[in-house]
Amino acid sequence: MTKVPLIRDYMATNLITFTPDTEITRAMNVLIDAKISGAPVVDQAGNLVGILSKKDCLKAALNAAYYQDWGGTVADYMSTQPETLDSGLDLVKAAEAFLKSQYRRFPVLSDGRLVGQVSRYDILKGLSEQWGAVEVNRAF
């Protein structure tokens, strides 16, 4: 029986993160400059407290358009209680979680602390490597 790799073997660990007190305008600029769709929000101990997504930032932008006020912090706009996956979860179970969810990536926790992030791409890559997917000619 082949052992299925774990999320920890394929997740990204070098993440952009925010704290709840980060100014929303600074966080938006970081997302734009890094060309990413969102980032985890952590407290001083590294515990995940939320996610700031482009959708959350659109709320701040609309607020600014209506009220001419770009004030606020990440805590004012972030999504709280995000869905997460455990770093010890195998890739098959992770794939099942992605199929049941609208999300393209999940924060990854170990003992309750943020240790990485895993995307659909990461899971697909890992499963492909595991079961020897046929190499496709990528020169289209």
Language-model regions, residue ranges each:
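General secondary-structure edge motif
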Residues: 11, 25, 37, 57-58, ...
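The conserved cystathionine-beta-synthase
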Residues: 18-35, 42, 84-102, 109, ...
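Tandem CBS (Bateman) regulatory domains
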Residues: 1-14, 53-84, 88-99, 114, ...
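Short charge-dense sequence patches
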Residues: 4-9, 23-28, 41-50, 76
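A glycine-centered beta-loop-beta connector
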Residues: 31-34, 39-56, 98, 106-122
